[in-house]
From Swiss-Prot:
Pfam families: IspA. Plays a role in cell envelope biogenesis, maintenance of cell envelope integrity and membrane homeostasis. It is a multi-pass membrane protein. This is Inner membrane-spanning protein YciB. Keywords: Cell inner membrane, Cell membrane, Membrane, Transmembrane, Transmembrane helix. It comes from the Bacteria. The chain crosses the membrane at residues 22-42, 50-70, 76-96, 121-141, 149-169. The keyword Membrane applies. Its main location: membrane. Coiled coil: none annotated. Belongs to the YciB family. GO terms for cellular component: plasma membrane.
Length: 179
């Protein structure tokens, strides 16, 4: 259910883009993200930081897109969010000395520090590459290509990278945890 709530605003954005335009889709994205946030709060009585940051970014950049009637803002949102995620991962590892990935998954998994560091760094690089790819697609290709890339391309890349991360984790798990 949680994954569906995270993905729902993206589906709404895509549908409204196909039915109307980028501006109606941006407004629908704001509303859908807010509703998903409210529903999550009432169902789980908890909002994850990443979810809250994403909502705030959608609210700010979606509103700027509507107020200035300029799709550059909603296009930049993707890169800024990915860059913030990458920075959070890098700061957690390099400054705070405990990878964010380990903080998120360390209660369920026991892995060597080297594995946590590699996984954390891999996700940071992944987010940076996705942010750069978004810049390229958003500013050098037609808007319709960017929307498809945002909805399907980045989602597929994230799913594949998550699966690869799962394989990497499994290969380094202690035998007793694999059961």
């Amino acid at each position: 259910m949680k994954q569906f709530l995270d993905f729902l605003p993206l589906i709404v954005f895509f549908a409204f883009y196909k039915l109307y335009d980028i501006y109606v889709a941006s407004g629908a994205l704001i509303v859908a993200t807010a509703l998903a946030l409210v529903f999550t709060w009432f169902k789980y009585r908890k909002i994850e930081k990443m979810t809250l940051i994403t909502f705030l970014m959608v609210l700010v950049f979606g509103t700027l897109t509507l107020v200035f009637h300029n799709d550059l803002f909603i296009k930049w949102k993707v890169t800024i969010i990915y860059t913030l995620f990458a920075l959070a991962l890098l700061i957690s590892q390099l400054v705070l000395k405990k990878p964010l990935v380990q903080r998120m998954l360390g209660k369920e998994l026991t892995l060597p520090d080297k594995v946590w560091n590699s996984l954390n760094l891999a996700w940071a690089v992944f987010f940076l590459v996705c942010g750069l790819a978004n810049i390229y697609v958003a500013f050098w290709l037609p808007q319709s290509v960017w929307v498809n890339f945002k909805v399907f391309g980045l989602t597929a890349l994230t799913l594949v990278f998550t699966l690869l991360s799962g394989v990497y984790i499994y290969r380094h798990m202690p035998e007793e945890q694999k059961k």
